[in-house]
């Protein structure tokens, strides 16, 4: 399997591309296999995933196993935004703040860190609504970590279409791509991102 291949080659960091890890019970089995590989060989040392927001019990069990074996930094509880207008414009929905608060309390009780992520620059978001959303997360109990990411326009995405850009008055900045979890070596090919500057 790919995971055994990673372990055999002593690859320390495994970033899972599944955007809804924990949705299926097989994901618990995959986690057990990963934990077994780490206990056997020491690798992978870290496993990161984006978790399904509608599978509370599976995700909690997975996060507990990874946390108990020091393989993860915590459970993702992402929001993108707490602005109803911004969420509507990007066709997203969130957990209720009450449900979020109860999940944070459950993870805190089990000593599993949680972190939340917001996206800065979504169409329909204002400075005030962004700050209000951040305050709401803190008031709901998120005291461990909140990461804020730029809103990036991706090629061939709905948000990247000319019609969408015109509808929301999106202006972008063309900036050098920020590679996380990569070597410091200079790349021969420069990559760029289109970051939302205003809407």
Task: Give, region by region, the residue ranges found by the protein language model.
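Flexible glycine/acidic-rich beta-alpha junction loops that bind and position SAM and/or redox cofactors
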Residues: 24-25, 80, 84-91, 120-128, ...
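Catalytic cores of alpha/beta
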Residues: 59-63, 123-139
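Intrinsically disordered, low-complexity coil segments
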Residues: 68-69, 139-143
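Conserved SAM/AdoMet-binding glycine-rich loop
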Residues: 2-115, 120-122
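Phosphate/diphosphate-binding loops
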Residues: 49, 134-137, 148
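Short, hinge-like loop/turn segments at secondary-structure boundaries
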Residues: 32-33, 133-134, 163-167
């Amino acid at each position: 399997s790919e995971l055994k291949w990673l372990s055999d080659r002593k690859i320390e960091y495994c970033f899972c591309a599944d955007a809804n890890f924990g949705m299926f019970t097989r994901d618990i089995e995959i986690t057990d296999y990963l934990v077994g590989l780490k206990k056997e060989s020491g690798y992978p040392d870290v496993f990161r995933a984006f978790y399904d927001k509608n599978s509370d019990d599976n995700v909690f069990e997975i996060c507990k196993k990874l946390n108990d074996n020091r393989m993860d930094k915590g459970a993702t509880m992402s929001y993108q935004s707490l602005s109803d207008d911004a969420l509507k414009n990007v066709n997203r929905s969130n957990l209720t703040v009450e449900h979020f608060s109860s999940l944070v309390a459950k993870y805190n009780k089990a000593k599993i860190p949680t972190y939340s992520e917001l996206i800065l620059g979504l169409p329909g978001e204002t400075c005030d609504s962004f700050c209000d959303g951040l305050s709401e997360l803190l008031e709901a109990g998120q005291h461990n970590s909140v990461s804020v990411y730029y809103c990036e326009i991706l090629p061939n995405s709905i948000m990247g279409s000319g019609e969408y850009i015109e509808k929301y008055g999106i202006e972008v900045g063309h900036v050098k791509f920020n590679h996380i979890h990569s070597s410091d070596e200079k790349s021969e090919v420069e990559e760029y991102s289109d970051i939302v500057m205003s809407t």
